A protein has these predicted regions:
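Intrinsically disordered, low-complexity, positively charged segments
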Residues: 4-46
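A general structural motif
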Residues: 19, 52, 59-61, 105-109, ...
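Structural motif
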Residues: 25-27, 66-68, 88-90, 112-117
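Short internal beta-strands
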Residues: 54-58, 62-67, 111-113, 138
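Short acidic-glycine loop/turn motifs at beta-strand connectors
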Residues: 57-61, 78, 130
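Compact, glycine/acidic-enriched structural inserts
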Residues: 68-102
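Hydrophobic or amphipathic alpha-helical targeting/insertion segments
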Residues: 100-153
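Single conserved hydrophobic/aromatic residue that forms the stacking wall/gate
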Residues: 159-168
Length: 168
């Protein structure tokens, strides 16, 4: 599937689940800096492969927020996808939460996979929804419903290393 086809499938799923705005971060269950293949949902839905960024999908728009390290890469990878690049920190570019607050209407539902957002982010989203008398659905991984060949969760053993130096 192309990115526009994935977005179309996601929007259909959003409609079926009564989700009006859906947030797709770059994160895993442990808030790791670099995520395994299973957790590259934002890459799957936007086509952007950088290690940092968050997508916000509405019924009619798809936007990706990323920082200056990735402006050139993101612009190239988003070309032709209908995903709009939001260059964080640049003049005239709204902060992501301000955009969510703008597009989320009263009585609508903001959705995200609560397993991959921090408590702080979840609280921010709940506060935005509260201002709009909107609902929050944090128990929905819509990407999993449309990503047919999604890599399975890693079952590798965890290895605990000894500290490299000890402090007296």
């Amino acid at each position: 599937m192309t990115v526009p086809e994935r977005l179309s499938a996601l929007r259909k799923c959003m409609e079926e689940k009564n989700i009006d705005v859906y947030v797709v971060p770059t994160a895993d269950f442990h808030q790791s800096e670099y995520v395994g293949e299973h957790f590259k949902a934002r890459k799957f839905i936007t086509g952007f492969s950088g290690s940092a960024g968050t997508a916000v999908i509405t019924k009619t728009e798809a936007r990706l927020w990323t920082d200056g390290r990735y402006f050139i890469q993101a612009a190239a990878q988003l070309e032709g996808t209908t995903v709009e690049l939001m260059k964080m920190g640049e003049p005239g570019v709204p902060e992501m939460n301000a955009y969510i607050e703008e597009v989320l209407k009263e009585g609508e539902t903001l959705g995200f996979d609560g397993r991959v957002v921090s408590v702080g982010e979840g609280e921010d989203y709940a506060a935005i929804a509260g201002k709009k008398n909107a609902k929050v659905n944090y128990q929905v991984d819509l990407i999993d419903e449309i990503w047919e060949d999604r890599p399975v969760l890693s079952l590798s053993l965890i290895h605990i290393s000894e500290p490299t130096r000890r402090v007296v």
